[in-house]
């Protein structure tokens, strides 16, 4: 049955504008706004709209995804046009290219959903959240993967009980819980259904929120007794100036002075803080940085690009200058970025993209992977598992290093995206990783968001974005494993995929 409100929503003059409006509101559920309560309402309204016009389910889902991802990732245009100087003739269509691809996943979800002939309560209340989560997982994994904008990230805030599921099953379990909450709200608010049918989703909503709240109070990792002070350097180097030859010395001087101003145990510089290949630097530069830190009793990590050991490529690295020896350049401990950004750090289609790179004047666009098995870097009394840039958007890939680490660290340069929401969305992903892995996460960035995050995902300290500053604070080393660290996302997702297949098998057999 259809309520009076639904009759209005069904009308094409309202249906399509409402669909676009709901999708365009999704950015407000994520950082920096953190209106977490809005996402289940948006998701529920979106599902209800599709229920009203099921014939347009796939096209509606695609339009919703296209609108949501375009409004969330508008900062692609900032990187292409404002920073790289690409004319709007190229920048505008290229900005839509990623959202147009990502929108295929919501469309796939509802294409699969239409294949199920099931009672409404099961089809909406059980199967749809499962399919949505599975397609979100596929979006994070297929090709190079891009998990930004998963609805679970909207719940990574101190106020949402659903964030409590992160240490159990990662961000995808939070996504599943968010989708469940959205569709159960639809079923619970259906005033055309019998009161008995509305009672069950109300009970499920209460149970879900209670379970999330309880999970949030549970600790799986523990302090190992070590305490450290950290200093996270934010140079605020304009991206349009960063790689200019006449800016190299001023940039190095700026970071050298910042290192000299802190006596923290651990000092971390951002991604590619020194805009010169390590092997091309005069050897005394790194020696001076190491000496400056040593004089202040600090261990120092520096973001810098370097040639690979075979000399045939280059890596995006963080080098550990603790115990640096000028005559042993090849013995410097380092972490090299492994999950590279397609079209940004390597060229998947060089015959098509090389002319574009020349127009954009992009430096260092063909990095090599650092490899999946890299050890934590020992700095003072902490073993630090580093990741660089958007690597902390892939939780499963951080598990192996985190098991042997007491602290997580991200080095980034978000200056590509100006003063947009990109830095805050990235910060929220780091909050999720801290919760999933049960450890402090520290972030050293060029322009923001430089921050210290607790194992509960709370932002303890944050530097003012777009300023030259040093953020100092205290952290504790943590050990132990969360349930998520033991299984990752794949195993329990395979379980719910099996459940979905079992539901389809049972009900099809009943029909026959």
From Swiss-Prot:
* GO terms assigned for molecular function: N-acyltransferase activity
Task: Read off the Pfam families from this record.
Answer: CN_hydrolase, LNT_N
Q: Report membrane topology.
A: Multi-pass membrane protein
The EC category is transferase
One GO cellular component from the entry? plasma membrane
Q: Which UniProt keywords apply?
A: Acyltransferase, Cell inner membrane, Cell membrane, Membrane, Transferase, Transmembrane, Transmembrane helix
The main location class comes to membrane
Q: Which domain of life is it from?
A: Bacteria
Give the residue spans that cross the bilayer: 5-25, 56-76, 92-112, 118-138, 168-188, 195-215, 487-507
UniProt GO BP: lipoprotein biosynthetic process
Instruction: Please describe what this protein does.
Output: Catalyzes the phospholipid dependent N-acylation of the N-terminal cysteine of apolipoprotein, the last step in lipoprotein maturation.
Q: What HAMAP family does UniProt report for this protein, alphabetically?
A: Lnt (MF_01148)
The UniProt similarity line reads:
Belongs to the CN hydrolase family. Apolipoprotein N-acyltransferase subfamily.
**Protein name, as recorded:** Apolipoprotein N-acyltransferase
Give the lineage. Answer: Bacteria, Pseudomonadati, Pseudomonadota, Betaproteobacteria, Neisseriales
Name of encoding gene: lnt
